């Protein structure tokens, strides 16, 4: 990736905040392996830089959604353990073995097909984590008998290693009994067979709210980056997480709309008086969505309204007269109390903080801050 960029919109990523959040989980669960979830490009932050920094701060295990994500980490020197949480097509099993990546076993049928596709040339081990469906209703084995049968199949092959078993909570970020019921179901199933090296069920919410002594690993995702999975979780815990992302754009032009003049597609905003506007080089192609019309951004400490429709590449803001080209504008802030916090943006978009971060597109350069050091990655100029 290039360390150069040629546009006036970018993300700031605070690596020290990410490391601090990782240490929060290490402290909460001192006897458990923290499987840092860096899928979806580390929730938009940039998986390679984040994984490297976490390794420097003690991370030994990562989780991703796809083999492609795992291979990307391997290609950039990430040597720690990696688990693919999603389903790999059985025909591609040799690639996982080649790159020393652990895989999820979602069903007995998948395991049988995967074994058929292991070439005779492969002598390396294949680490497997069996997924149990305890109530999420997605991937995984639902009954104890099938779980035991899958373990027996794995044990028939010297090359295969039954390394882990896990489940995923559906409602850990909400009040109610379902999470407790899932956890009990998980324990009951796992206790009916031999236990692997890793037993894990806690996502970010589960890791913040539950002890789960039966398990010896946790899988925090969104909260590694400084964000609570829900308002309910934030209110229930005393743990302080540090938000790690800012979205910045610099004004590229200012101009004055006269009374009666409109701006942007559909002419949805018409000035009633002479109005100074600032044009920002960012739009919905960057993940700053059309629905953000009517929201507010921070321009030199002033809360300024987004007017007119957000375009693919440009956003228009009503600003004080003294604003000029080059001024910095905060669209997403890394302070939880800010009117531009990820949570405020998520509420405006009628979604969750996860989606806001994941929507921030690859064409935005990422500027990483590690104390006094600064690094840039630009995926468009690889």
Swiss-Prot record:
Homodimer. The active site is at residues 39, 265. Its cofactor is pyridoxal 5'-phosphate. Belongs to the alanine racemase family. Keywords: Isomerase, Pyridoxal phosphate. Pathway: Amino-acid biosynthesis; D-alanine biosynthesis; D-alanine from L-alanine: step 1/1. Substrate binds at residues 138, 312. GO terms for cellular component: cytosol. The lineage of its organism: Bacteria, Bacillati, Bacillota, Bacilli, Bacillales. It holds the Pfam family Ala_racemase_N. GO terms for biological process: D-alanine biosynthetic process; peptidoglycan biosynthetic process. Its EC number is 5.1.1.1. This is Alanine racemase 1. Catalyzes the interconversion of L-alanine and D-alanine. SUPFAM superfamilies: Alanine racemase C-terminal domain-like, PLP-binding barrel. The keyword Isomerase applies. It catalyses: L-alanine = D-alanine. InterPro entries: Ala_racemase, Ala_racemase/Decarboxylase_C, Ala_racemase_C, Ala_racemase_N, Ala_racemase_pyridoxalP-BS, PLP-binding_barrel. The modification N6-(pyridoxal phosphate)lysine is found at residue 39. One of its GO terms (molecular function) is alanine racemase activity.
